[in-house]
Curated annotation (Swiss-Prot):
Component of the nuclear pore complex (NPC). NPC constitutes the exclusive means of nucleocytoplasmic transport. NPCs allow the passive diffusion of ions and small molecules and the active, nuclear transport receptor-mediated bidirectional transport of macromolecules such as proteins, RNAs, ribonucleoparticles (RNPs), and ribosomal subunits across the nuclear envelope. Due to its 8-fold rotational symmetry, all subunits are present with 8 copies or multiples thereof. This is Nucleoporin NUP133. Present with 3060 molecules/cell in log phase SD medium. Keywords: Acetylation, Membrane, mRNA transport, Nuclear pore complex, Nucleus, Protein transport, Translocation, Transport. The modification N-acetylserine is found at residue 2. The keyword Transcription does not apply. GO terms for biological process: cellular response to heat; double-strand break repair; mRNA export from nucleus in response to heat stress; negative regulation of transcription by RNA polymerase II; nuclear pore localization; nucleocytoplasmic transport; poly(A)+ mRNA export from nucleus; positive regulation of DNA-templated transcription. Its main location: nucleus. Residues 44-236 are annotated as: Required for normal NPC distribution.
Length: 1157
């Protein structure tokens, strides 16, 4: 026996001090401080193991500044079946725990730190119905020699292990020393037992429900039928002896206390009060009907004393009724617990609100007065973190107040833990029971357990709650000592849970569900504030769980990436519809930058050349920004500056170095872009996080700024790299080998430009139009997107090209790619049909434009007959842009009037001049012919006239062009030099281009020639211009032509020129148009139109001195004025016009200078 005692003593010396040291240090040593130092030089797997393990072989599952949850080194689950009904119990005062099913009980030292915890196994007596019997209730008792006084030593410092009481059916079995029966079968251990038959009607379904070790008085147990039994376990000599207290031994009654219960009443709480003396202790009893009693029990006195007997149900109900009217009829009493003040108790109750299907759990502090058998409700408040209804009838919520076990505790703060079936709510309140110092909560928090975790028992000590689970052993909920309020900033509720999920959720077999209960009400502002704090800590590596450095930057980045993924997963599950899209985008941006750093780091560390360029870029940045950054500080502490430096790096690599480097360098740069932008941003950031995890719509953008990876420099670099690498591969004949990389770059570019378009549509139009950077980005896309598709088609990625173009609605790219396919193939035809249906109007219009641009008119008109109506609509909406094609369709459709109008619109309008002369003539002739097929009632004579006028103008242009080519005409000698000669030369060059010349230019060109025919033609054109010229221009040109006729006539070479031209004017009846003036001195000398504005409008497009040409025209007018110095010119004009008019029998109105018919 002595050897055994030595062995036990040695085992305690090995194990207990470790546990004692741990318990003493938990309040001062937080998990992160303990593990931080050794995180430096370990692998990722080793790090995770080390990160969450303590030196006593326990494993931390979560921690914040208020509590720690960890598992003790206990694995009793292997001894039981998963289907077994288990009961558990821990007595921290004794220092042992137990778990039992209906066959056996396991008992172990709860403070053991051994890897393989030794167990004491006690089998139960086998009965015929054991397989269907309920598991017995078991409780531990103090060692026989244990000092139970208030000044007793810690029981774990004593040698004896204590005893065990089993309530099996109606029988109580007591073993004084559990070590003496370890692993003995029941027959061998039976001689060590002491038994007592209890008046429990087990055959009628009555069973032990609650048990309380209230030593030194004995034990108290209650049954499911509301009966209570007090049993002493030792006689007056201290020897083991089970004895049912006389208090329960009255005939025809279930017990002396039974008068307070009815068939619907059950005991919900048995709690110990203080030890009053040798063998005497107070016990508190609460029922579900609100009856509360205080009893003084003694091991030597068979007559317990009842000190308090009250019903608190109606009082609690009344305290809730005003705020919660639904409390009436739904109030349930669950548990009670004594507070530090021996006269006060904390009660847990619940009420149910059917309108929202929520259960509110209420903590009521009640002060009792034993002298008057009365009570007062001091405070009432509701738990805010747990609102589920209790559906498991076997589980009742329980209150634990660890500080109560510390007799010398003078802390003004009381920690309260409420254990629910799948959660533990922890709160701290002020412990002062003073009406001027209300018992308001300091804080409240919740630790949720996984749904598959079953709680089978519990226990607690001065600092912790211990929860026995069926699957995970013993979980310790350690409440930290209250810190000074000013020592650290208060950590918000959301941030606390976010941090726990980030840093602890990936621990293997973690029993904690880190997601918040959905019923918790949290305001958006506090949620977003806390989420921003956590994201900043991970991003800038200043979170308390993030190591300052690991072996490599890659390892450090990977750790933070995993933390950020945990963070985003938690956000998605708990706050996805409670935070703004802007915050989501901010979180995504941080993750993407971090991920991009990882990808970037993995590439440049493999290339000395790229690494040197990066270091030089970083040095230049430091020089310009007056910084002292290193790659390490950028990646670890300042990743927000990485995009700026990365942009400078890419610009230098792509635009400076790329063309002159070898193919391997170019391949590395291409891989770098794909790894960073495609893998790091598009796949792992945008696709996985933005759209799949956080469920953002592509249209949801932060209108205040563009996404971090979209700016002109990035887009320009990626676009340039794509083409430079393509050309390099083509030169060495390896383009097909790198087609997958090129495809990724195209996907990058399309996504970036698409996001830019979405964002730009949210901005004010004025600010967009005024921003050159935005214009440059738009131009970059317009200039290059068709070429991206062209390259992909080159490497036979037409299918992928079509998919991309379809997805991003790049219809011009889609059409271009479809046109590279066999147009007669059934698959191609099917694709066209698909896109006609998918984009009914847009695709058709884009296809029509492409076919017109590439002169595939046969396909336009005949290949897609089912699109005929859409084609007509296209021509109508795009008129007159595509009128040169629309008329063909209109003629084929028999719409001759429409065809005539279309052709008129594209030829008659002077602003459309510049097209081919022959094409314009063709259009006009077809329009004229179409008029012959138009019904008379629908024919527009004015339109027909305009068509004829334009045909006449074209004839005039062809005439002068041919004469100039043949040398049959020449410029008047007066214009051999000067600005007018320059205008002449310019217009002659325009004639050579065989495009339609403006009517005003044509008139002026004719007026510069020196023969009668050339000077008469512009007069004919001006008389029938069909309103092609406005009034001022026409007036100016009339004066210009007549003036030059008069001046040429005044010279020797132009004698009788004026008379001949006037005669031809009357012969062809040009004056019949009232807009046609006859020559007069006033008309020839009119200077009113010769303003700088008019000259600029008329001659501004010519590269000549406008002042010079204005002076030359003034000189012409001056010469006319000289000719009329003696009024001779006026007389000559009248006589010439009069003689010709008389000959033709016309009457001249000299006041208006017109002919009267």
């Amino acid at each position: 026996m002595s050897e055994k005692k030595v062995h036990l003593r040695l085992r305690k010396e090995l194990s207990v001090p470790i546990a004692v040291v741990e318990n003493e240090s938990l309040a001062q040593l937080s998990y992160e401080e303990e593990s931080q130092a050794s995180l430096m030089d370990i692998s990722m797997e080793q790090q995770q193991l080390r990160l969450h393990s303590h030196f006593d072989n326990s494993k931390v599952f979560t921690e914040n500044n208020r509590y720690i949850v960890k598992t003790l080194q206990t694995d009793y689950s292997s001894g039981f079946s998963n289907d077994d009904e288990l009961n558990g119990y821990i007595d921290m005062q004794i220092g042992y725990g137990l778990v039992n099913d209906h066959k056996k009980v396991y008992i172990w030292n709860i403070h053991s730190t051994q890897k393989d915890t030794p167990y004491i196994t006690v089998p139960f007596r086998s009965d015929d119905n054991d397989e269907i019997a309920v598991a017995p209730r078991c409780i531990l008792t103090f060692p026989a020699t244990m000092d139970e006084s208030p000044l007793a030593l810690n029981p774990n410092d004593q040698d004896e292990t204590g005893g065990l009481i089993i309530i099996k059916g109606s029988k109580a079995i007591y073993y004084e020393d559990i070590n003496s029966i370890n692993n003995l079968n029941f027959k061998l251990s039976e001689k060590f037992s002491h038994e007592l038959e209890l008046p429990i009607n087990s055959s009628g379904g009555e069973k032990c429900d609650l048990m309380l070790n209230c030593e030194p008085a004995g034990i108290v147990l209650s049954t499911n039928m509301g009966r209570i039994f007090f049993i002493t376990i030792r006689n007056s000599m201290g020897k083991p002896q089970l004895k049912l207290g006389k208090l329960l031994n009255k005939p025809f009654k279930l017990g002396i206390w039974s008068k307070i219960f009815n068939t619907n009443s059950s005991v919900v709480s048995l709690r110990n009060g203080p030890i009053l003396g040798k063998g005497t202790r107070l016990v508190y009893i609460t029922t579900n009907k609100g009856i509360f009693q205080t009893w003084q029990l003694s091991a030597t006195n068979s007559h317990p004393t009842k000190l308090i007997d009250v019903n608190i149900y109606e009082a609690i109900l009344e305290s809730l009724q005003d705020l919660y009217p639904f409390a009436h009829g739904t109030l349930k009493i669950w548990d009670s617990h004594p507070l530090q003040d021996e006269s006060s108790q904390l009660f847990l109750s619940s009420i149910y609100d059917s309108s929202c299907n929520e259960t509110y759990y209420i903590l009521s502090t009640i002060i009792f007065d034993s002298s008057s058998n009365s009570f007062t409700i001091f405070s009432t408040y509701r738990l805010n973190t747990f609102m589920e209804s209790i559906t498991d009838t076997k589980f009742k919520p329980k209150i634990f107040i660890p500080q109560m076990e510390n007799a010398n505790d003078t802390n003004e703060v009381t920690s309260i833990l409420v254990m629910f079936p799948n959660a533990v709510v922890i709160t701290q309140v002020n412990s002062k029971l003073d009406s001027s110092y209300s018992m308001r909560r300091k804080w409240e928090d919740i630790v949720s357990l996984r749904n598959d975790i079953d709680i089978i028992g519990s226990g607690y000590d001065s600092k912790s709650l211990y929860v026995l689970t069926k699957q995970m052993g013993v979980l310790q909920f350690f409440v930290k000592e209250n810190e000074e309020t000013n020592s650290k900033p208060e950590v918000g509720f959301v941030k606390s849970h976010v941090d726990q999920a980030v840093y602890f959720s990936k621990i293997n077999a973690n029993p904690i569900d880190f997601n918040l209960p959905p019923e918790i009400s949290l305001d958006q502002e506090s949620i977003e504030h806390d989420l921003k704090l956590t994201s900043e800590e991970i991003f800038h590596s200043n979170g308390k769980y993030i190591p300052p450095m690991l072996n490599t930057l890659g390892q450090h980045l990977s750790v933070r990436k995993e933390f950020f993924q945990n963070f985003l997963t938690f956000v998605a599950k708990n706050f996805n519809y409670k935070i703004s899209p802007e915050l989501k985008l901010d979180l995504i941006e941080k993750f993407e930058i971090l991920n991009c750093c990882i990808k970037f780091n993995s590439i440049i560390r493999q290339s000395d050349v790229l690494n040197d360029i990066w270091e030089k870029t970083l040095s230049n940045y430091n020089l310009t920004q007056n910084e002292h950054l290193t790659t390490k500080t950028v990646v670890i502490n300042s990743p927000d500056v990485f995009p700026v430096i990365f942009k400078q790096f890419l610009n230098h690599v792509v635009f400076v170095l790329f063309p002159s480097q070898n193919q391997n360098f170019k391949l590395n740069v291409t891989n770098l872009i794909n790894l960073c932008f495609y893998d790091g941003i598009l796949e792992e950031g945008e696709k996985t996080i933005r759209y799949e995890l956080l469920e953002l719509d592509p249209m949801e953008v932060d209108t205040s700024k563009l996404p971090w990876f979209i700016n002109f420099d990035y887009l320009n670099c990626i676009n340039q790299c794509f083409f430079d690498f393509t050309f390099a591969c083509e030169e060495e004949g390896s383009l097909d080998s790198y087609k997958e990389g090129l495809l990724k770059i195209v996907k990058i570019l399309y996504y970036q430009f698409n996001q830019f378009k979405i964002w730009i549509n949210t901005q004010p139009v004025k600010s967009v139009n005024a921003n050159d950077n935005f214009i440059n980005i738009n131009n970059l896309y317009d200039d290059n997107h068709l070429d991206w598709n062209h390259v992909l088609c080159k490497v036979n990625l037409k299918e992928q090209c079509i998919q991309i173009a379809e997805f991003y609605k790049d219809l011009s790219g889609l059409v271009q790619t479809l046109q590279t396919l066999d147009q007669n193939d059934s698959t191609t035809v099917s694709l066209y049909e698909t896109f006609f249906n998918e984009f009914p109007k847009e695709f058709s219009f884009t296809l029509f434009e492409y076919l017109i641009k590439h002169k595939k008119l046969n396909d336009l008109i005949f290949r897609f007959p089912q699109q005929h109506d859409v084609l007509i609509q296209f021509f109508q909406e795009s008129a007159p842009k595509y009128g040169h094609v629309a008329w063909i369709q209109q003629i084929l459709d028999g719409s001759y009037a429409d065809a005539m109008n279309t052709l008129k619109n594209i030829t008659v309008d002077d602003s459309k001049k510049g097209e081919s002369l022959s094409e314009c003539e063709l259009h006009l002739n077809v329009a004229k012919l179409s008029s012959l097929l138009v019904e008379k009632d629908n024919l527009d004579i004015n339109t027909l006239r305009k068509i004829q006028y334009n045909l006449d103008t074209i004839d005039a242009e062809k005439n002068i062009s041919n004469k100039l080519k043949k040398g049959e005409v020449q410029i008047c000698k007066r214009f051999k030099n000067g600005s007018i000669r320059e205008v002449f030369n310019i217009l002659v060059e325009e004639l050579k281009s065989t495009t339609v010349v403006n009517l005003s230019d044509l008139v002026e060109l004719y007026s510069m020639l020196d023969d009668e025919e050339s000077l008469f033609i512009p007069l004919r054109l001006l008389s029938v211009d069909g309103n092609l010229l406005n009034f001022e221009v026409k007036k100016f040109l009339n004066a210009l032509v007549w003036r030059r006729i008069v001046l040429l006539n005044a010279s020797n070479e132009g004698d009788k020129l004026l008379q001949h031209i006037v005669k031809r004017v009357f012969d062809e009846e040009l004056p019949k148009n009232n807009d046609f003036p006859l020559p007069s001195v006033d008309l020839l000398c009119d200077k009113s139109l010769l303003t700088p504005e008019y000259i600029s409008e008329t001659y501004g497009r010519f590269p000549i001195d406008q002042n010079a040409i204005r002076e030359e025209i003034y000189e012409e007018i001056s010469q006319v004025e000289t000719l009329n110095s003696d009024n001779s010119l006026e007389i000559k004009l009248h006589s010439t016009i009069g003689s010709v008019a008389k000959e033709k029998n016309y009457t001249i109105n000299y006041e208006t200078n017109t002919v009267e018919y």
